[in-house]
Amino acid sequence: MDTSVNVDTSSRPAHEPATAPGRFVVRDACHEDLPEAAAVQAVCVREIGQGVIPNDVLTEVTGPGIVHTTIEQWNHFMDDGAIFKILVDRLDMRTVGVAMARVSTSSDAPTPWEIATLHVLPEARNCGASDNLLDACIGNRSAYVWVFADNARAISFYQRHGFHFDTADGAVDDSLGGVELQRLIREDIIESQ
């Protein structure tokens, strides 16, 4: 399996701005979508990890080997009932975002559902597409998500969707070179499913 999926992050044509109605659509992901979705995640992690994750670790955790491992892991999660959604740019039918939620396996989970990933390429940000992706993935479910403690953009995004900081201490992700994480929680939502 070729895991060296390239994702073009160049600017889109001026005649079709990100805010054009219907430019970005959310759909259920299938197994065949996972390589491109994992590549999107790698691009986004490289972006948010700059200056936060040590360079050698960042190169390792966003390289082809990890992308391949992510694809394998996501295939298992999908088979086990995880919810996968992708965001597609209708200009060229590329995947520009991915979201995955699953029933948490953590013993200290504050809610049944965990948002395990939500990443959107820069050209699809700030136009409502990320909001649509999150809504399609978890709807009104109570959920939690771990974010980099200093990722103000992600924290603001989740707070706009009713998430708040967990009162428990954050965590440190040693696999990312000791990055500090913060958990955000959305509770007391009427479950839609």
Mark where each language-model region is:
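Terminal substrate-recognition subdomain of acyl/acetyltransferases
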Residues: 2-19, 177-193
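Conserved active-site alpha-helix within GNAT-family acetyltransferase domains
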Residues: 131, 150-178
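Acetyl-CoA-dependent GNAT
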Residues: 6-7, 12-13, 24, 28-34, ...
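Conserved G/P- and acidic residue-centered "switch" motifs that form tight phosphate/ATP-binding loops
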Residues: 128
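Short hydrophobic clusters on alpha-helical segments that form packing/core surfaces
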Residues: 136-137, 154
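Conserved GNAT acetyl-CoA-binding A-motif
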Residues: 139-150
